[in-house]
């Protein structure tokens, strides 16, 4: 049943491989004002806590202090029904596997249905942690208004063929040749300490996802809005289910000439200035609706099953630990991974060969 305001706050433990070190310092930066209480939720970031009503795992369980592959095992202090996994990578990069997914009561994901064999999937954007460089509180009160330059992008030198990295890299390099004013940041290009440097001084930002599927928009778009930029965007096909149409300019990077003309026209006719109200609204949506903890603070109470019945104490294992302890299951996971990778490759091929 949905959580009631009359009850005590739900205590939700949050674990993440991405925040294995110093989670109590790192994760509160993504909470409004750094407060652990948000709506009906009290967030718990202590990895050894055993007093909680819910467990949320972001991508995978944390690394153990010795480092290397995650050996973490979490002895549940709540019913398995009150657990949630958030997938943080597309199907072209990570296959979570049926057995790992089965450990959780719910899965929040932007992966395709055929990649998530689970009875309770929630297909949505996943509130992926942003790389913008400012805390939630800092971003909320500091809209970048001093824009000195036109256009930037952040693009690594990755050129994997099984994802859209290679297409993104090729498009970016070609665009730089046509538009020398494009500032390219990232590994293999111009170094930055923080993504703020690549966003705050610029009016426009080229944001290209490495995967194309519904609901899959990432920090590449969220960071752009947080930096107060107008995105030239390629990625999530239903992005306008989330943001106002005036808040971004979609591109099809398979058509370079049309994309180049779209970018030049937008800059020439000052689209940034005319679309500024929509950018403000998109930025508000990121901070208040789609950011990880505000989003979860609404979702978890709606999923909550309150029970006073005793429940069997169970264990959730990291992906690595599960495969290590279930060698036969690991073989089946390898087969599952191969099958999903083939499906992802077919999907990519169909997308690249589809009419423009």
Task: Name each model-derived stretch.
Residues 2-86, 98-183, 196-205, 214-356:
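Pol beta-like nucleotidyltransferase catalytic core
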Residues 208-210:
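Short Ser/Thr-rich beta->loop micro-motif in glycosyltransferases that lines
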């Amino acid at each position: 049943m949905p959580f009631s305001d009359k009850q005590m706050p739900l205590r939700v433990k949050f674990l993440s491989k991405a925040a294995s070190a110093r989670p109590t310092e790192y994760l509160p930066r993504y909470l409004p004002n750094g407060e652990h209480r948000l709506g009906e939720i009290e967030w718990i970031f202590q990895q050894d806590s055993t007093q909680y009503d819910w467990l949320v795992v972001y991508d995978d369980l944390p690394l153990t202090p010795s480092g290397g592959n995650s050996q973490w095992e979490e002895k549940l202090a709540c019913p398995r029904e009150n657990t949630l996994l958030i997938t943080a990578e597309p199907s072209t990069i990570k296959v979570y596997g049926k057995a790992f997914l089965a450990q959780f009561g719910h899965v929040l994901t932007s992966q395709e249905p055929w990649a998530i064999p689970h009875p309770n999937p929630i297909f949505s954007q996943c509130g992926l942690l942003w790389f913008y460089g400012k805390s939630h509180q800092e971003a909320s009160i500091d809209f970048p208004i001093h824009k000195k330059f036109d256009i930037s992008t952040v693009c690594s030198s990755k050129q994997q063929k099984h994802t859209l990295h290679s297409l993104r890299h090729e498009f970016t390099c070609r665009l730089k040749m046509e538009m020398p004013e494009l500032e390219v940041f990232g590994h293999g290009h111009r170094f930055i300490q923080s993504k703020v440097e690549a966003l705050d001084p610029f009016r426009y930002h080229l944001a290209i996802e490495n995967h194309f599927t519904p609901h899959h928009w990432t920090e590449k778009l969220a960071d752009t809005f947080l930096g107060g930029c107008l995105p030239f965007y390629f990625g999530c096909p239903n992005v306008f289910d989330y943001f106002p149409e005036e808040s971004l300019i979609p591109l099809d990077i398979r058509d370079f000439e049309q994309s180049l003309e779209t970018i030049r026209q937008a800059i020439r006719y000052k689209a940034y200035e005319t679309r500024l109200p929509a950018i403000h609204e998109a930025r508000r949506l990121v901070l208040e609706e789609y950011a990880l903890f505000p989003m979860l603070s609404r979702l978890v109470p709606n999923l909550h099953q309150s029970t006073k019945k005793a429940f069997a104490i169970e264990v959730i294992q990291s992906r690595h630990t599960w495969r290590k302890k279930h060698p036969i299951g690991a073989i089946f996971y390898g087969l599952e991974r191969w099958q999903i990778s083939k499906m992802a490759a077919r999907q990519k091929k169909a997308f690249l060969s589809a009419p423009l």
